[in-house]
Amino acid sequence: MLTNIAKKIFGSRNDRLLKQYRKSVARINALEEQMQALSDADLQAKTAEFKQRLADGQTLDGILPEAFAVCREASRRTLGMRHFDVQLIGGMVLHDGKIAEMRTGEGKTLVATLAVYLNALAGKGVHVVTVNDYLASRDAGIMEPLYNFLGLTVGVIISDMQPFDRQNAYAADITYGTNNEFGFDYLRDNMVTDQYDKVQRELNFAVVDEVDSILIDEARTPLIISGQADDNIQLYQIMNTVPPHLVRQETEEGEGDYWVDEKAHQVILSEAGHEHAEQILTQMGLLAENDSLYSAANIALMHHLMAALRAHSLFHKDQHYVIQDGEIVIVDEFTGRLMSGRRWSEGLHQAVEAKEGVEIKRENQTLASITFQNYFRLYTKLSGMTGTADTEAFEFQSIYNLETVIIPTNRPVQRKDFNDQIFRSAEEKFEAVVKDIEECHKRGQPVLVGTTSIENSELVSKLLTQAGLPHNVLNAKEHEREALIVAQAGKVGAITVATNMAGRGTDIVLGGNLKHQTDAIRADETLSDEEKQAQIAALEDGWQAEHDKVMEAGGLHIIGTERHESRRIDNQLRGRSGRQGDPGSSRFYLSFEDPLLRLFALDRAAAILNRLAPERGVAIEHNLLTRQIEGAQRKVEGRNFDMRKQVLEYDDVANEQRKVIYSQRNEILTSKDISDLMQEIRSDVVSDLVDTYMPPDSMEEQWDIPTLENRLAAEFRLHEDIQSWLKADNAIDGQDIKERLIERIENEYAAKTELVGKQAMADFERNVMLQVIDNQWREHLAAMDYLRQGIHLRSYAQKNPKQEYKREAFTMFQDLWNGIKFHIASLLTSVQIEQNPVAVVEEQPIGNIQSIHSESPDMEELLGQSQTDLVTEAFNPDGTDFSPEALEARGQIVHRNDPCPCGSGLKYKQCHGKLA
């Protein structure tokens, strides 16, 4: 109560921010006439002027009013769109690194141009992040004329682009792309073995469209680059036969083999279930008699069994996935879109493939991963925009340090939001939905019906067909027709059935989207120019009449067939109606069979229902019920927030390790001379090895000299008689032995370097180091994943799982780092160089030049392409200079992908171009 009184007296934080922004709006508006008076050339020259002022020390905030005024005027001239005052406020909110909540239809795409233009002037690049390739290409195409007019370049990142094209797109002043593409490019950049293969620049400023969808809904979905692991595919098929033999428990304490916790989306085997599963697996010959699923040797069996149980109990066709072209394609639970190319991890995808009888593809091993939470926190400045952020404002603030500012609408919202209607059964609910649609259709009012699953959208479609009502269905299966269906959803009497509308990205215009219709006519190659003009003219004449008719009928009517777990998704559905002051209405139809009511509000709601006891087909409308449902939604939102926060807390541990590894990789990639680093690694490894078998401050009797000598011979090809050193000099200690061994290793290494050349050896070292780091990091990620999966069991021993995870992860990372150094030192020290004469270069195939030999059995696998790095020396015995500078001086033009002129057969960038 005191908070409400304070808000009335002083205004809310949001009110105070808007008041400050309006002062800046007044300054921008005061410059409008001045900008309108400028010629195109003078207006365009402002960009160069701003860049110079920034170079002279002025800040972006200092030039903001002028830059916004220039962008607004340029937009008016190139796009025919002038920014409203509230859009100027939105632009300032984005520039300040905050989230702008703007209603559907308020022009978020245009708002972004203000902050994007201003921040692009700094020359460090700006990323505009969208939810799919279509929106990235569309928004970039619409706004490119504006940016080009102002002297800025625009790039677009879409899937399947080649690295060279990606480099060009990232080099542009402004880069559009999806959250997935930006994230995967970051991971790929940290896997390259040549710094020139990187595509991204520094992560400077990002504007995230539909920020709640990306930073909230997808926060728990990590980006993973993976490779195929060695896996027994037949085991998935065998395990798929086990779940039908196990009995599902009706309640958590009931009889049976396993309990399905729908709230937590988990399957828990009971004690009896473990015994039953062990009996079945023993009969199948997969488990030895009296053996346990919990023994270390049977971890893989337990992993496959739980994956099969989850596939059968929690993942359902046409709700969580569809089968398309013989493959399992995941359905996004928030947007209803197909997520082609994505696969569930931990063997779940293979278990679902086995359940559905489609081809089982091998389980993947993680090579690199990052969550969106940690990726977007890498940007120097981050901002976002959406129509629904206020309900998640606390999460944005606590996790991303992003404040949410609610931007007022340009025109007052005219939409009427009716109370929910609640029915006893789903059958009664859908009957009422069809009746409401029928009434709207009769008066010409367009209707958008929102469902939470493909299954429900197809059920509604079936009922509408039976009622003789024409309609369009928009769900994951109709992805190709999506834009066309949405564009016409506002026509007179149109009925559109859609899975969740989150992130659809296309406004529903009353009377139909005229631009989409005229574009379709212009693209029709069967029509002549005269026919096209005639059809467009007729369309434009008829559109206004249709628009007016829809307005009179009440605008777009939204029908929700059930409440989503998140109020935000419900608000997104409602927000499709009433854009820019248009009339509209919305109503949700619920039943006590809906998952939300069944799982979270059943007890009290059932008691209320029994008291009211309506007849069949009669709806209940009661404030207490509405509050009960909203309370259930808040409960789910709170639980989901806790889960996302927990994911972040665990991922933060891996994130710190990731930063160290990627920083070290980058240092190796970019350093011209890594000899000091190599020397330090060799010294550390030898010191650690000596300390292991000759512990400091220990007696000589405790030393294990024979094992030390064997390890030195096996790992470093260093055959030294340390026993004789000790006999010859009684005063010798561990430190003296370290110094002698390091001196021997350094002398041998210097001889090898002299043999092949310093630069060639440096490149060889760099490749080996990178490959060792990548291999060891990959194994570490798998170990961290296994640790994470089982760490919750520590709570049974009265230990804090998070603290235990941090402690063990730290120990594992120390072991990782020591292992990396040991493998690098061992491989590079044990390498032998063989000189093979090259009499006639043209007749000597590269494959016959054996530059490196190793007794280590996995040397070939670890080194891979590194063997060819020494070829450059063999093909250039007279030391001819093939550097870019020398070639240019001789008038030779050699591009990076051309064959090297030395005759090695390698590309220039992999040969002397790389050495340069």
From Swiss-Prot:
Pfam families: P-loop_SecA, SEC-C, SecA_DEAD, SecA_PP_bind, SecA_SW. One of its GO terms (cellular component) is plasma membrane. One of its GO terms (biological process) is protein transport by the Sec complex. Part of the Sec protein translocase complex. Interacts with the SecYEG preprotein conducting channel. Has a central role in coupling the hydrolysis of ATP to the transfer of proteins into and across the cell membrane, serving both as a receptor for the preprotein-SecB complex and as an ATP-driven molecular motor driving the stepwise translocation of polypeptide chains across the membrane. Its EC number is 7.4.2.8. Monomer and homodimer. Part of the essential Sec protein translocation apparatus which comprises SecA, SecYEG and auxiliary proteins SecDF-YajC and YidC. GO terms for molecular function: ATP binding; metal ion binding; protein-exporting ATPase activity. PROSITE patterns: SECA (PS01312), SECA_MOTOR_DEAD (PS51196). PANTHER family: CHLOROPLAST PROTEIN-TRANSPORTING ATPASE, SECA INNER MEMBRANE COMPONENT OF SEC PROTEIN SECRETION SYSTEM. May bind 1 zinc ion per subunit. This is Protein translocase subunit SecA. Zn(2+) binds at residues 900, 902, 911-912. ATP binds at residues 87, 105-109, 507. It is a peripheral membrane protein. Belongs to the SecA family. Its cofactor is Zn(2+). It is found in: Cell inner membrane; Cytoplasm. Keywords: ATP-binding, Cell inner membrane, Cell membrane, Cytoplasm, Membrane, Metal-binding, Nucleotide-binding, Protein transport, Translocase, Translocation, Transport, Zinc. It catalyses: ATP + H2O + cellular proteinSide 1 = ADP + phosphate + cellular proteinSide 2.
